[in-house]
Design a protein with these regions (language model features):
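C-terminal interaction appendages of subunits in large macromolecular complexes
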Residues: 2-169
Length: 169
């Protein structure tokens, strides 16, 4: 029956994958393990990148909050300075800003700087701190990274999966 009907078919696959930069022929189990390791690394690197971006933005928001408290003095320093370097040094000394924060404030148009709300900046600061905390806790343990990978793969299966067409009895 198997020989004369298409009840049993065999097909071959080319299961070559790059493992640590070298091509290897993998079985199904090894291919799945390599894929999971890859996804774990992707989640780790993405989380580290997002954490670095959030920390960078948090530093800028902290500097803006310092400047917003005495916005009139900031505008006076900027307008009273001969050039950008003098204004930057004055801002750094007056408000104890970092070089990056002072540059960001100087690059911002004055009308945008004056329209910034302290409340908005404080809410953004709180959000950034919570995001950084979540990302640090995610990066702290391998189990949480694997749980994130599992959640992402479940989401992909939910979005792109097709339901079973035959019934198992």
């Amino acid at each position: 029956l198997y020989r004369l009907t298409p009840m049993e078919d065999a097909f071959s696959i080319n299961a070559v994958a790059l493992v640590n930069g070298k091509p290897q022929t993998l079985g199904l189990k090894a291919a799945l393990q390599v894929f999971i390791e890859h996804r774990v690394e992707v989640v780790r690197r993405r989380s580290e990148f997002r954490k670095a971006k959030a920390e960078s933005r948090l530093k800028l928001v902290d500097g803006l909050l310092k400047a917003i408290i005495d916005i009139d003095k900031v505008i006076k320093i900027i307008r009273g300075s001969d050039d950008a370097a003098v204004a930057k040094d004055s801002l750094i000394k007056s408000f104890k800003l970092t070089d990056e924060q002072a540059t960001y404030i100087l690059d911002m148009p004055l009308r945008r700087l004056t329209k910034m709300s302290k409340l908005e900046l404080e809410t953004e600061q709180k959000e950034l701190k919570s995001v950084i905390t979540k990302l640090k806790s995610l990066l702290a343990s391998e189990e949480s990274i694997k749980a994130q990978v599992s959640e992402e793969l479940s989401q992909v299966a939910k979005e792109h999966g097709t339901p079973r067409r035959t019934k198992i009895s």
